[in-house]
């Protein structure tokens, strides 16, 4: 029966997909891709949910079928745009190709061009691996971008499965937790980016901690530990696993500005609660993470301290800008997509809280999973993260929240005959089915509801290629924004080449498309070799997310075409590029990428701090490896105590140097 449901679900889901051509995609409105999907596709997605839920009924797991349905669900949910859209989706993924192109062309980074160059680890690793594999052609790189989200979501299942094995629960709860994770991965941070790469590192790091480095916990007050005891391992094997955990963190630090601090927060709270055996790990990881920010990410914060860290403590303002601030304005239909995201995140977190309570009632004490689920919320007190902090918080909270949500339906471990008898008559699989149907329906709306402007159209790519070809020595490209001060990321396949030679200038989009005079004036002020681009993706964004009229793009293009001082230099079905008929006087300025990174201001205090930090990392790392050789409850050895006292003065010097750098350079 489950195999038949799986086959029927896949057939219903994929057979109508070839009928989704470019004309059908052009009809997308406020609901995005789900608004143009044939009903059999939706029925197929529901059948995949039913197939998995049916497999939760038997007394023994059918692992092969469970795995097949899970993988088929992930592929179906995440591969759809890659199959139906002519170009790889999402504008920022194209921009990240520009980082690879710049690295390949110049051999270095350019911190003055973009703050992300202060964390170049992902771009350097991707450029190295792709070149080693012979992937250098732009068409081949585009295919990497196309299939990257699917690969990330499939790879995420591996650490999730390991994380699920750390929970003292029955097989239904473990499989259901991984399933809920897959159905709730609609956040959209899986595109070709440092965030998606470091998210995989975060999942693997958390799985290692909870599987092999949980501190021993004995039953107390009639409550059993909610986590399985770590497997027996020799000191040598534990040392190797610790080395892997440190390598994962070390790979995340130079690749992303947020992920290492989430990893640090999780391990710190686990240590404070007595649930992590690596008691010295927070200090070691903290020195590494803060040291990178203070020294190698100096261009990111130097001179912008208040702008970057002024949001610390502003919990209410950060939550508002991340949640309600992203829903204001826009079309009523598209607001359903934004409200569905809030509702789905709230549903998963509510199920997680219910799961914690049901585990408590069943006699299990959960500590580790709530840490994974709720520690990321501390990000709200740090920064608004460009209005995206709510999405990032849910992204990092999802592994723990999904497993806790599964425990709401299957709270017992099934280790006693009484628990097994209860599971045989429980209607929990039916309840999980209903939850799965809600989650998969919500996924299709929340994940693909922005596709009208997150989709990349062929004509937009052609227009950008024309711009790159004419960026000699530089070019200013004006694009239309509803708020040039706050909305600074265009819905265009921008930045994939010539990073230092194209300056993107957000320009106020007139609410009344007839009033296009300020656009021509902005072109004059931009100077020679300046162009104005009007793309369908950005126009769709303005209509759906900023409340511009549905006829706005058509009327604006007619107005621009009618002006005597403007001439279209590119015109196709998806984009138009305009230039002044009489170019402004002057000579285009030369490209100024700035000095190659890393850019560090060295003072005597900085040199002393860097040397102290390096020695401190070595001492703390050696101390942690030595502690692994002792029994869990054994007192510290003389060598461990000696390393601690040697580390104290180095820590004081390092902290003093870091404070001095922030104070003098901020």
PLM segments and residue spans:
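Hydrophobic/aromatic-rich transmembrane helices and adjacent perimembrane loops
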Residues: 195, 387-418, 641-654
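Membrane-embedded helix bundles of polyisoprenyl
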Residues: 70-77, 148-233, 237-264, 437-442
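Juxtamembrane membrane-water interface segments that cap and precede transmembrane helices
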Residues: 20-33, 131-139, 313-339, 585-600
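Alpha-helical transmembrane segments at the extracellular/periplasmic loop-to-helix junctions
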Residues: 38-48, 148-150, 257-258, 314-358, ...
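Membrane-interface helix-loop-helix junctions at transmembrane boundaries of multi-pass membrane enzymes
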Residues: 56-61, 227-239, 276-282, 350-373, ...
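Transmembrane alpha-helix segments characteristic
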Residues: 65-75, 241, 245, 266, ...
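Active-site lumenal/periplasmic loops and adjacent helix-entry segments of GT-C-fold
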Residues: 54-69, 75-199, 453
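Extracytoplasmic
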Residues: 150, 407, 417-424, 432, ...
């Amino acid at each position: 029966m489950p195999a038949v449901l799986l086959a029927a679900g896949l057939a219903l889901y994929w057979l109508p997909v070839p009928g989704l051509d470019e004309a059908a995609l052009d009809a997308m409105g406020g609901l995005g891709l789900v608004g143009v999907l044939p009903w059999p596709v939706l029925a197929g997605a529901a059948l995949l949910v039913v197939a998995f839920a049916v497999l939760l009924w038997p007394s023994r797991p059918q692992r092969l079928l469970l795995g097949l349905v899970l993988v088929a669900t992930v592929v179906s949910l995440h591969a759809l745009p890659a199959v139906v859209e002519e170009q790889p989706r999402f504008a920022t993924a194209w921009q990240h190709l520009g980082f690879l192109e710049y690295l390949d062309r110049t051999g270095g980074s350019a911190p003055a061009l973009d703050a992300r160059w202060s964390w170049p680890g992902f771009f350097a690793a991707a450029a190295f691996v792709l070149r080693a594999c012979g992937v250098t052609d732009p068409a081949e790189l585009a295919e990497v971008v196309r299939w990257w989200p699917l690969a990330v979501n499939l790879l995420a299942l591996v650490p999730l499965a390991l994380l699920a094995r750390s929970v003292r629960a029955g097989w239904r709860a473990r499989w259901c937790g991984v399933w809920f994770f897959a159905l709730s991965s609609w956040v959209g941070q899986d595109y070709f980016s440092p965030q998606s790469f470091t998210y995989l590192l975060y999942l693997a790091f958390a799985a290692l901690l909870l599987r092999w480095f949980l501190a021993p916990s004995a039953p107390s007050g009639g409550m059993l530990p909610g986590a399985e005891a770590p497997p027996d391992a020799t000191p040598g094997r534990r040392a190797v696993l610790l080395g892997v955990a440190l390598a994962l963190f070390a790979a995340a630090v130079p690749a992303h500005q947020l992920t290492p601090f989430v990893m640090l927060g999780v391990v710190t709270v686990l240590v404070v609660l007595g649930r992590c055996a690596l008691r010295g790990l927070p200090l070691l990881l903290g020195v590494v993470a803060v040291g990178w920010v203070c020294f190698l990410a100096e261009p990111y914060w130097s001179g912008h301290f208040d702008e970057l860290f002024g949001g610390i403590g502003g919990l209410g303002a950060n939550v508002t800008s991340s949640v309600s601030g992203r829903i204001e304005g826009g079309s009523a239909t598209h607001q359903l997509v934004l409200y569905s995201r809030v509702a789905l995140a709230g549903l998963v977190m509510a199920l997680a809280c219910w799961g914690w309570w049901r585990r408590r009632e069943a006699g299990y004490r959960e500590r580790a999973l709530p840490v994974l689920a709720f520690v990321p919320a501390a990000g709200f007190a740090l920064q608004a993260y460009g209005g995206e902090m709510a999405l990032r918080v849910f992204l990092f909270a999802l592994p723990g929240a999904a497993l806790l949500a599964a425990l709401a339906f299957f709270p017992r471990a099934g280790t006693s005959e009484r628990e097994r008898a209860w599971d045989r008559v429980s209607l929990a699989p039916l309840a999980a089915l209903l939850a799965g149907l809600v989650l998969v329906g919500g996924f299709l709306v929340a994940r693909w509801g922005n596709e009208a402007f997150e989709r990349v159209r062929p004509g937009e790519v052609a227009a950008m290629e024309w711009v790159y070809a004419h960026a000699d020595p530089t070019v200013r490209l004006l694009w239309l924004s509803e708020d040039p001060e706050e909305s600074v990321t265009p819905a265009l396949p921008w930045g994939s080449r010539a990073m230092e030679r194209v300056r993107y200038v957000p320009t106020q989009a007139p609410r009344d498309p007839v009033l296009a005079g300020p656009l021509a004036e902005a072109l004059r002020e931009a100077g020679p070799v300046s162009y104005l681009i009007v793309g369908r993706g950005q126009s769709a964004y303005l209509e759906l997310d900023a409340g511009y009229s549905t006829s706005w793009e058509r009327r604006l293009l007619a107005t621009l075409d009618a002006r005597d001082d403007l001439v279209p230099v590119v015109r196709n079905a998806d984009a138009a590029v305009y230039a002044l008929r009489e170019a402004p006087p002057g000579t285009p300025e030369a490209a100024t990428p700035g000095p190659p990174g890393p850019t560090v201001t060295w003072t005597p205090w900085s040199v002393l701090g860097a040397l102290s930090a390096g020695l401190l990392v070595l001492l703390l790392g050696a101390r942690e490896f030595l502690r692994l050789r002792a029994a869990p409850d054994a007192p510290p050895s003389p060598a461990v105590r000696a390393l601690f006292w040697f580390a104290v003065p180095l820590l004081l010097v390092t902290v003093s140097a870091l404070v001095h750098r922030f104070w003098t350079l901020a």
